[in-house]
Swiss-Prot record:
Cellular compartment(s): Nucleus
Domain Chromo: 837-902
Residues forming the catalytic site: 915
Signal peptide interval: none
Domain of life: Eukaryota
EC number: 2.1.1.37
Function, in words: May be involved in the CpXpG methylation and in gene silencing.
BAH domain: residues covered: 578-693
Biased composition (Polar residues): 61-72
Record protein name field: DNA (cytosine-5)-methyltransferase CMT2
């Protein structure tokens, strides 16, 4: 809407609200500022249209919040006279103080008779006279204060006689304004404007263009696929000029002579009446031409550009050189060209058969358009634009004419300068055609013609304009410069086309076309024969026949989108001077400055003339699940993957050398003479890093580096690493031995003896429990860090006293024998006072301060001659330097009995390094940097021990929080350490309830294996489970479970009743360590858990049978009298908890005391309801004093048997669960015994790995060790595995 000239500057700067008024139909505003002929002007408004000032006094501004002061406030009286529009309808007009008239637009409503909220110019009396347009039709006009007039577009209806629904200005006259009652699509479809196309017109144009030009240029947009590819139209031997010319003529003829063309909002940008500017003068009349800024349709780009003075000033700078053009065919690639000096910001590069033929580009500048022909790898020619004089007589619309001229290969493009929306429509790439319609006939415009000449010259030339500007080729592209080489503007001639799509947390690779440089690429040689191509890539041709977009049945998150319309295959391609062949490794463009490495497995051309290659991606360490934790890895190491996809050929950068090396633990590939190397495959499923045995690339150009190939074959290494009879296990952080016990039981079923040879834990009671159940295990009550130092010292001792045969034998000299001499018999009786102790033997070794003397270091435990064993002492090794024979004897004996492991002589290292710093029950944990917490340092020590001992297999267990805290940095660190040591690795999340337990406890497990061993898979679940809480979404691919749609046969989930219903009734005061069974087992689980050690291990040593077995540790933790009184008040029903105690009310799920009741007091004087239940989780928790129920699954077994914060009460007995009941929930057999106090035994059970889970893992380990589990991520357990004994499963296991 055109505002009066005298506007208040502060209000004029008010922000626009383009969404204040709702509308039921698409808006398309068409405003034309014009000056009528004087002879046709009405007497009421005879002054000429004056030049619009440039000082901003007047602003041509579109707003929904505009208003003017009411006539009452300014002493004026607005009048509206009836005007006949071109459609013969009366239109209301308002006359302002100076006689100027303003068209009323129903899209904008005045508020309280005010114009646009920015003007205080009163509306005075005055009539509105009829104006004759140049088209001979009457149009209603509103006269503004400076005499300018604005036509009202009849496309927008009035609303109840008000200005734009927000105005209270009265509308007078005989008829008032007419309101359109029809809002139908047909009504909109038939509507037209003096400068627009109806939908029918557009449909005719589009149909004509599609029939004649679609075969020449096919527009594709792959944004929906996450990839926008650069596409060159297929080259065909068709006269595109003739096609285009005939298309335009047929389009023009299809328009009715009496029908005015209207721009559709669906194809053109809307006009935004916002601000005014003097853009230049017409040669004919010398009148000012006002222009409007433009709004980008939200249907086209999703953004809105609001006009302002700065925008119009920039347009003014272009002067008469500004041209508008309509494009016949939608452009395929658009790149914004930056503005500098006198260059229009709207200059863009357009490419499409509407203006140019195949392999050509169109450059649009303020003074014309230039067509650029590309032949092979060089620019064929650049044409010269020729400009003609500007004639603005009778200008109402912009038109386009492309016709043959006398010059061969020449095209003439005619443009007219009126409205910038035509140019913006061209730049938006929307199909449109617009002709000038006046008095029933189409008019050809000859205003600013540009003749494009095509030459056969091979030399690139600069473009010289008539005004002295030149287009020269510069290093970064092209530049437009003025005559004095000032104000050079770089022209970005390339379109950023990239293919990026990520879903979930899957690591994928996509190639991205570079934004500021176009690659010159083409295939070399003749296409491969159809027979050879179909033989090598048969699947692609079959895919083409099925017209499918994806190979096979791909999931929605599959990044391997396949191009199906293949035409032919090639063996070589050339990109920017680099020749690529099938099987070559290459750098490939990525996002921003990132480059990727991949192997070319296919070159092909599509039926659209597009050039593609198929790449097999190779990952860097930081591209995998390890992410930032892999920054210290070898930068040249890559990981093979099976991920492939199709990308445009111009994404290739250059060739690179990649070698495959033989995998080996501790490999130091310093002598590899290549850019990159790889020895493992990476798969996102279960974050698997696996030895690459048989590369699956279609073009195998892999080479092995001779400098890093081991001198011994893999078979010989495998034989040396194989363990005769048994696989020795080191159990770190062993606790009572839950993990190693389960591994032994499961591996036995698979036919492998996994023996726990060594165990280390800092808890004395836990070490005693493990020793009680594994008497042949070397159990060390040490810290893991001290144990690592001990291993290093033990290795030195073995090398000195066992492996070094040339070592000189020292004479054992005890302290007293050193003092003895041949004259000792003549010594006096006083010598007996200086008696010295004699070392009889050394019985143990340690590192640290076991005797709490404050002295750290390597120590031996000395048994003194003549003293009892309980009087043995720890002595520093340096104080026993004269006891070399005793040390040699101890080391030799210890080496034979394997009291300590040596590097390379350990079969399995398993353990769960404690991470109290990240435990969910630790309220003071460091969630941002968990590795900096000293309580989380044990995971580093665990990996240090693995790195030193180099076992064949590694199994680490930990809480799920290592994948939650700090984006899973602890889990990524552990995986990174294994991979950096050249171990194969796999990470999974397993739930105890899935393996036959009535407990929902999830833990993270990480497998590791040396390169020449099979990486153990994870066992698939055997039971359904009742889910209690969620798992990390980022690691959802690591949850061990059946895939969707995979057939499964799961047993029913176990509940509490299945596990403990057969145990005898005991009270809170029960203190017997052994009890007889009072009933027979009732479920399969109970029968299995009562099995003897012989039944589960197959060992003949244990002679105990079920009849003589007693029930151990079926006694509860004794709760105090006050808590026992509270427990007795908890009802014996499902869901009962402390809220059932008297004197409580619940409001909004929060518990508080009932003020109407006196608190119940216990005999001790304390209240029945303790105060901590109100502060625990702000009184919202239901866990304090909660009873479990028979049909429930226990969330997890805790280390502290407290009922204050956990649901731990027996369903029908007034006590907490007993030690044996907790052990059963963890899968410990009834024969397994515990040592220590009652609290310590609960703690051992709560810290242990569920035996049923480790048993399933042991089976997977045994199958991998035997070579029966190849490269699968998962393995299916035998039927009834979870609750069957060793003899029962022998018939189903392959041997």
């Amino acid at each position: 809407m055109l505002s009066p000239a005298k506007c208040e500057s502060e209000e004029a700067q008010a922000p626009l609200d383009l969404h204040s008024s709702s509308r039921s139909e698409p808006e398309c505003l068409s405003l034309v500022l014009w000056c009528p002929n004087p002879e046709e002007a009405a007497p009421s408004s005879t002054r000429e249209l004056i030049k619009l000032p440039d000082n901003g006094e007047m602003s041509l501004r579109r707003s929904t919040t505009l208003n003017c002061n009411s006539p009452e406030e300014n002493g004026g009286e607005g009048r509206v006279s009836q005007r006949k529009s071109s459609r013969g309808k009366s239109q209301p007009l308002l006359m302002l103080t100076n006689g100027c008239q303003l068209r009323r637009s129903p899209r904008f409503r005045a508020l309280h008779a005010n114009f646009d909220n920015v003007c205080s110019v009163p509306v005075t009396k005055g009539g509105v006279s009829q104006r004759k347009f140049s088209r001979g039709k009457s149009q209603p006009l509103l006269t503004l204060t400076n005499g300018c007039q604005l036509r009202r577009s009849p496309r927008f209806r009035a609303v109840d006689g008000n200005f734009d629904s927000v105005c209270s200005v009265p509308v007078t006259g005989k008829f008032g304004s007419r309101k359109r009652k029809s809002n139908s699509a047909l009504d909109k479809k038939e509507s037209s404007d003096s400068e627009g196309l109806t939908f029918k017109d557009i449909a005719v144009i589009a149909k004509s263009l599609e029939m004649e030009i679609i075969s020449e240029c096919q527009y594709k947009n792959n944004v929906a696929e996450g990839r926008s590819r650069l596409q060159d139209p297929a080259k065909r031997k068709v006269d595109s000029d003739t096609l285009l010319y005939s298309s335009i003529n047929s389009s023009k003829q299809s328009l009715g002579s009496n029908k005015r063309m209207r721009r559709s909002q669906r194809f053109m940008k809307g006009t935004e009446n916002e601000g005014e500017e003097n853009l230049g003068k017409s040669k004919g009349k010398g009148m000012s031409l006002a222009s409007c800024s433009f709004r980008r349709s939200t249907r086209l780009s999703g953004t809105v550009e609001t006009g302002n003075t700065e925008t119009l000033n920039r347009r003014k700078d272009c002067g008469p050189a500004l041209c508008g053009a309509e494009q016949v065919r939608g452009t395929e690639r658009l790149v914004q060209i930056s503005k500098k000096d006198h260059c229009c910001e709207a200059m863009k590069k357009c490419e499409g058969d509407g203006l140019v033929s195949s392999k050509q580009e169109l450059l649009v500048f303020p003074s014309g358009c230039i067509k650029k022909t590309v032949n092979g790898c060089r620019d064929r020619t650049l044409g010269k634009p020729r400009s003609s004089g500007l004639n603005t007589d009778d200008i109402h619309t912009s038109s386009l004419k492309i016709s043959k001229n006398d010059t061969s290969n020449g095209l003439t493009m005619t443009t007219a300068l009126v409205e910038q929306d035509a140019m913006e429509s061209l730049l938006q790439g929307k199909t449109s055609a617009c002709g000038a319609a006046d008095k029933g006939k189409t008019r050809e415009m000859h205003v600013n013609s540009t003749v494009i000449y095509l030459s056969d010259s091979d030399e690139p030339s600069s473009i010289e304009y008539l005004n002295g500007d030149n287009l020269t080729q510069v290093e970064s592209g092209s530049a437009l410069s003025s005559g004095g080489n000032e104000g050079i503007v770089s022209l970005d001639l390339n379109n950023p086309t990239k293919s990026t799509k990520r879903k979930g947390k899957r690591v994928t690779r996509t190639a991205v076309q570079e934004q500021n440089k176009r690659s010159i690429c083409f295939f070399i040689g003749e296409p491969l024969s159809c027979e050879e191509a179909q033989e090598r890539w048969r699947w692609r041709y079959e895919l083409k026949e099925r017209k499918s977009k994806s190979r096979g049945q791909q999931s929605e998150d599959d990044e391997d989108k396949i191009v199906a319309n293949v035409e032919c295959h090639y063996s070589q391609a050339k990109v920017d001077g680099h020749t690529f062949s099938l099987g070559d490794f290459a750098y490939i463009k990525g996002e921003e400055e990132e480059t990727h490495v991949g192997q070319i497995v296919e070159f092909f051309k599509t039926t659209d003339g597009e050039s593609y290659f198929r790449v097999q991606w190779f990952y860097r360490a930081t591209d995998t699940i390890m992410e930032r934790q892999a920054t210290n890895h070898d930068k040249r190491r890559l990981f093979y993957s099976t991920v492939m996809n199709d990308n445009p050929v111009d994404c290739l950068i250059s060739k690179v050398t990649v070698l495959q090396v033989s995998p080996r633990v501790g490999l130091k590939p310093n002598s590899i003479k290549s850019d990159y190397y790889f020895d493992m495959e990476y798969c996102v499923e279960y974050s698997t890093f696996q030895t690459l045995r048989n590369p699956k690339t279609s073009e195998n150009k892999l080479e092995c580096c001779a400098d890093v190939v081991p001198t011994e074959s893999t078979e010989s290494i495998l034989k040396k690493k194989s363990f005769s009879g048994e696989l020795p296990v080191l159990d770190l952080y062993s606790g009572c031995g839950g993990m190693s016990t389960g591994l032994s039981l499961g591996a036995k079923i698979s036919g492998v003896d996994v023996v726990t040879k060594w165990a280390v834990d800092q808890n004395t009671a836990a070490c005693k429990s493990l020793k009680l159940n594994h008497p042949n295990t070397q159990v060390r009550n040490d810290a893991a860090g001290d144990f690592l130092q001990l291993l290093k010292e033990w290795d030195k001792l073995c090398k000195r006293y066992v492996f070094n045969n040339d070592q000189r034998t020292d004479t054992l000299r005890s302290v007293n024998s050193t003092k003895e001499t041949s004259g000792s018999s003549s010594s006096s009786d006083d010598d007996s006072d200086s008696e010295e102790y004699e070392v009889e033997k050394l019985v143990d070794i340690c590192f640290g301060d076991h005797d709490k003397t404050g002295k750290n270091g390597l120590k031996f435990k000395v048994h003194w001659k003549g003293y009892r064993s309980d009087e043995d002492t720890w002595e520093l090794a340096e104080e026993l330097s004269n006891c070399q024979d005793a040390i040699r004897e101890f080391v030799t004996s210890g080496f034979k009995s394997k009291i300590l492991p040596l590097p390379g002589r350990v079969g399995v290292i398993c353990g769960g390094p404690p991470c109290q710093g990240i435990s969910g029950y630790n309220r003071h944990r460091n969630v941002d940097s968990p590795l900096n917490d000293e309580r989380n340092q044990q995971i580093i020590v665990f990996m240090d021990i693995v790195e030193y001992l180099k076992p064949s297999y590694v199994l680490m267990e930990n809480v799920v929080d290592i994948l939650r805290m700090d984006k899973g940095s602890l889990g990524r660190y552990a995986l990174s350490r294994l991979v950096n040591m050249r171990y194969q690795a796999r990470l999974g999340i397993m739930t105890a309830g899935c393996y036959g337990l009535s407990q929902f406890r999830s833990r993270v497990f990480m497998w590791g294996a040396v390169p020449n061993k099979n990486l153990p898979p994870f066992p698939l679940p055997t039971h359904d489970v009742i889910v209690r809480y969620g798992l990390p979404l980022e690691f959802e691919r690591n949850v061990v479970a059946y895939a969707e749609g995979q057939p499964r046969k799961l047993e029913k989930a176990l509940v509490l009743k299945d596990a403990i219903s057969d145990l005898p009734h005991v009270s809170n005061d029960e203190d017997r360590e052994k009890l007889p069974y009072e009933s027979l087992p009732k479920t399969d689980f109970q029968r299995y858990i009562r099995s003897t050690k012989r039944d589960l291990t197959g060992s003949a040593i244990d002679n105990c049978n079920k009849r003589t077995m007693l029930l151990h540790d079926h006694r509860p933790f004794h709760i105090n009298e006050d808590d026992y009184a509270r427990v007795c008040q908890i009802p014996k029903r499902k869901g009962a908890n402390f809220r059932d105690l008297p004197g409580l009310i619940v409001r909004n799920n929060t518990v508080c005391r009932d003020p109407s009741m006196e608190p119940v007091i216990l005999p001790s004087g304390k209240p029945l309801v303790p105060g901590y239940v109100f502060t625990f989780q702000q009184g919202k928790s239901k866990r304090p004093f909660a009873r479990l129920w028979w049909d429930e699954t226990v969330p997890t077994v805790l280390t502290v048997p407290t009922c204050h914060s956990q649901a731990l009460l027996h369903p029908e007995q007034d006590r907490v669960l007993t030690i044996r009941e907790s052990a059963r929930l963890q899968g410990f057999p009834d024969y397994f015994q515990f040592c220590g106090t009652i609290k310590e035994r609960y703690c051992q059970i709560g810290n242990a790995v569920a035996v049923s889970v480790s048993r399933a893992l042991g089976y997977s380990l045994g199958m991998a060790f035997r070579g029966l589990a190849r490269d699968e991520h998962l393995i299916k357990l035998p039927q009834n595995f979870s609750h069957s004994t060793y003899p029962q499963l022998q018939e189903t296991i392959p041997h």
